[in-house]
Amino acid sequence: MQTPNLPAIRALRPAWNKGRIVGKKRPLKPKHVWAIRVRLELAENHRDLALFNLAIDSKLRGCDLVKMEVVDVMASGQIKERASVLQSKTRKPVRFEISEGTRSSLARWMREPLMIGSEYLWPGRFHERLHISTRQYARIVREWVTSIGLEASAYGTHSMRCTKVTQIYKKTGNLRAVQLLLGHTKMDCTVRYLGVELEDALAIAEAIEI
């Protein structure tokens, strides 16, 4: 007698996202940016302060930020006012500004012993790792947001990328500028990224009283 082929019985596993907030990560508000900067300055954490400032200015994806090299931001011994990085996702360059405060924190970080002879801007702590990983970067961001009392699950590396462009859009309404700054190839990507349609609809609704 042949035994029928029955489906294998597997133990049920809880969903990977059970109990987690996995939606779009929130941008930091200006007061959050200020609070984190002050804490890093008081702690004299030069690496993290430079990383935090450049993450906001560059608006780069985490995978591109961690791989940045010293030559990307420095020329002839001076920190550049503008820089360009080739995006790993689109293989297209994106330009960004480096503000005065960010240049100052980068220059201070460059003077650290760990940076002597380093090719990468954020060198790894161990010889086999040339630069910090995206996982390490995510952990660092989590430490930043929790240090000022924010919920870690609501923020992430994406928060760093969208913090400045969110303020730019709120103040100017210029979607094209945001598209260029983020390095998006299509405008609809930028619209979805910022949640523009929903935000605009809510703003209109809030202005109407019945």
Task: Give the residues covered by each predicted segment.
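Conserved catalytic core of the tyrosine transesterase superfamily
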Residues: M1-I210
